Amino acid sequence: MPDPVIAAAKPSLVKLEGGRAYFWCACGKSARQPFCDGSHKGTGIEPLRFTAPRTEETLLCACKRTKSPPFCDGSHNALQGGYRTDAESGAETPIIDRDGDHHPTSWLDGGCFVRTLDPARALRRGALALTPAITAKDGAGLLSVFEARLMKGASDSFAFPDADIVAFVTRGAPAFHVNGERCETKPETGVLILNGESLRLENPHEDEAVVFLTVCPARTEPLWNPKGEIRQDAPRRRAFGVDPALREPMADRFYQVLNGPENGSREITQFIGEIPQSRAEPHQHLYEEAIVILSGEGFMRTQTKRAAVAPGDVIFLPRKQVHALECASPEGMRLMGAFYPAGSPALNY
């Protein structure tokens, strides 16, 4: 059987009607991509009939290399020229400086922004300083991000009602007490706290601990010392650290999922990303995303603007916003990303 033709280097964004049957072009020759128009006749490659499980927007494979037909699985990222571009290529766009009387922020196209957090804006409660980094006030509709800084000691118990949390430790080794269950961590550990569970942070060390909390759905502030019914599940693994054996390639980039549907995070996917000195092709996602830069410097680019990024900066990407993250550091860049709805970080169009 001949190999299918690559119809396009990126997947097709389509809106499917729940319960309706479709025929996905598997040969790559259809003029009605990503659907069949009969051009497969004589190729030996038959179209795939499938029924949409629900009415939704989704990405159907156009490179015909997916391992999950008809849906995109990110295989197009491995095509030559499918993702990476030279960091020095292309016309330069204006650099937007930080401004504002809130956290210093660079506002880019479509509501995308890069933010450097101002510690003076933190909400202080005992040993804990909690800073809202991304909330609905910034245009986020699906998730919020908070930076938690903890001196030696323990915080009060808190929760975000009717929301899941994925936490990420960037500094120190704080202990997480989730419904009273203790969970030890270290830098670059992701921790899952589900809807209905309460959280208390403890820092037994002299040095400050720093944790980023991604909350979904979006919330503006926590509920302190929550009362009433607390979710009680059997003890389970909550903390997931970096494991080189679990890295997934995405062209010249890599990622590792820390929390996602596979381990019970039904709403949010949290991942570690590694970027060499390069610039991504402009692309979009069907999810709303928050990014924290861990190391390396570069630029976040949108259609007509760009902003410098450095360790500690927070980036907000609205759903469907065209963007490209560039690493300018020879040693590369590391980042933590979290997005809703949960899925694969490799899916882009």
Tell where the protein language model's regions lie, with residue ranges.
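A short, N-terminal "cap"/entry segment at the start of jelly-roll beta-barrel domains
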Residues: 91-142, 220-267, 348
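N-terminal pre-ligand scaffold of iron-sulfur
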Residues: 1-34, 39-60, 85
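Ligand-binding loop in jelly-roll beta-barrel domains
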Residues: 139-141, 195-222, 310-313, 319-345
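Short Fe-S-cluster ligation motifs
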Residues: 52-74, 95-104
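Short acidic-glycine-tyrosine-enriched beta hairpin
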Residues: 166, 180-196, 304-319
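Short, conserved beta-strand element in jelly-roll/cupin
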Residues: 26, 147-151, 159-176, 217, ...
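Conserved short histidine dyad/triad with adjacent acidic residue
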Residues: 127-134, 144-161, 255-259, 269-285, ...
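Short beta-strand His + acidic residue motifs that chelate non-heme Fe in jelly-roll/DSBH
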Residues: 156-158, 176-177, 185, 193, ...
